[in-house]
């Protein structure tokens, strides 16, 4: 069991040469973020490969975990983001997930038909309106629109169900709002509202042996990405695959009231407020926070951002860090993914977390190519219900 790296062509996922990993390198996968990793190879090998196969953004690197039976599980993949850093004998490529390409795509209702002023004015006057869809389904449409461009093809498949209905969500993206219409930015906003879906682009090898990224996301009923296996980690057992465990806490974002601003200037700026007065019990002083989505004039969306920010600010954030053996069947790389829930058992030595077994969400994973050891970060899930908080219309 080991790591295996390949070059692939970004636009269609065509498989290129296998790379001999010559240095340690590292990788990191955050929840709802863009992955990052580096791969070092010998320059002698690169000289035997057409440079177009390691050209920034034209080419990608896919690193897979080779299981005991020899099968490959694609683990992390994405474009090479710049020329390699060189020593006399090696070249190191910095890579990011496919989100690095989506960061460089802009939502427009149509492609400019020409370079004429009238064509560009028409493009700016257009708008994209998505109605009667779950947030995850809107995310799918955003990605599809981002690929519907000359040179926009990407091997992205969609692995989560579409949800449509008249009582679901709507989003409108104005053509003139180019600075805020980045595809990745809009996906991040969809995840960031109350009960917003987790979104991930997970690489896999298809039946033809080419690479594709599968967009998966939560649903209206379950914002977390569906999983078919649950990891069980017992930190109290001497036979556990857990090598180390640490607990950290952060109270810097505690708040019982959040002000969220939207579009507008001066006294016309849109503001929505969310608060939880139950947090003021037992002589707890009020703590306030301010956030902004300056490009939105949608009052419901601004309110959702305020409520989501308040939900994330209600409690002290407790984070559990573990180092696990990713070659162990109980937590083998590829059986779990960032975003999964795991059963975590802790002892009674911790002051800030209770002893016992409880579900925790994997919010990040990182490691290196020199070993199978993986550093995992866990947090509790915190999903508010629609009636949890007051907004400004209800505040006396």
What are these regions (language model features)?
Residues 27-47, 89-100, 190, 260, ...:
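Oligomerization/assembly interface segments of phage tail-like spikes and tubes
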Residues 65-96, 344-379:
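Short beta-strand and beta-hairpin "edge-sheet" elements
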Residues 8, 40-42, 64-66, 81, ...:
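A structural detector for beta-sheet-dominated domains
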Residues 4-6, 217-366, 386, 390-396:
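Acidic, small/polar-enriched beta strand-loop surface segments
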Residues 73, 128-136, 176-184, 250-253, ...:
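Solvent-exposed, acidic/flexible segments
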Residues 56-60, 179, 339-341:
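Glycine-centered loop/turn motifs
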Residues 1-127:
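Beta-strand-rich assembly/attachment modules of structural machines
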Residues 98-247:
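Charged- and aromatic-enriched interaction segments used to assemble
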């Amino acid at each position: 069991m080991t790591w295996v790296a390949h070059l692939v062509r970004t636009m269609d996922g065509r498989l290129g040469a296998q790379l001999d990993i010559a240095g340690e390198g590292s990788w990191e996968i955050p929840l709802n973020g863009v992955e990052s990793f580096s791969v070092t190879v010998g320059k002698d090998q690169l000289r035997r490969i057409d440079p177009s196969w390691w050209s920034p953004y034209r080419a990608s690197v896919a690193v897979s975990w080779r299981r005991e039976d020899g099968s490959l599980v694609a683990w992390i993949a994405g474009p090479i983001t710049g020329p390699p850093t060189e020593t006399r004998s090696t070249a190191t490529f910095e890579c990011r997930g496919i989100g690095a390409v989506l960061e460089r795509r802009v939502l427009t209702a149509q492609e400019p038909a020409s370079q004429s002023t009238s064509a560009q004015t028409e493009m700016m006057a257009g708008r994209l309106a998505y109605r009667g869809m779950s947030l995850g389904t809107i995310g799918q449409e955003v990605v599809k629109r981002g690929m519907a461009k000359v040179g926009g093809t990407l091997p992205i498949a969609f692995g989560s169900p579409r949800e449509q209905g008249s009582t679901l969500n709507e989003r409108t993206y104005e053509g003139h709002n180019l600075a805020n219409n980045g595809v990745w930015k809009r996906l991040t906003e969809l995840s960031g509202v109350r009960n917003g879906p987790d979104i991930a682009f997970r690489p896999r090898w298809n039946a033809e042996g080419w690479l594709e990224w599968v967009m998966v996301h939560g649903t209206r009923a379950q914002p977390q990405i569906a999983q078919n296996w649950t990891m069980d980690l017992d930190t109290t057992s001497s036979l556990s695959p857990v090598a180390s465990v640490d607990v950290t806490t952060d109270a810097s974002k505690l708040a019982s009231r959040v002000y969220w601003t939207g579009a507008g200037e001066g006294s016309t700026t849109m503001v929505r407020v969310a608060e939880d007065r139950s947090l003021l019990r037992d002589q707890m002083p009020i703590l306030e926070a301010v956030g902004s989505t300056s490009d939105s004039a949608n009052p419901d969306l601004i309110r959702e951002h305020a409520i989501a920010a308040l939900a994330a600010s209600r409690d002290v954030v407790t984070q559990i860090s573990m180092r696990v053996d990713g070659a162990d069947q109980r937590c083998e790389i590829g059986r779990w993914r960032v975003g999964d829930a795991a059963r975590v058992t802790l002892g009674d030595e911790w002051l800030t977390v209770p002893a016992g077994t409880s579900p925790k969400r994997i919010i990040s994973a990182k490691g290196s190519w020199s070993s199978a050891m993986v550093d995992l970060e866990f947090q509790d899930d915190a999903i508010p219900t629609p009636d949890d908080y007051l907004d400004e219309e209800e505040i006396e």
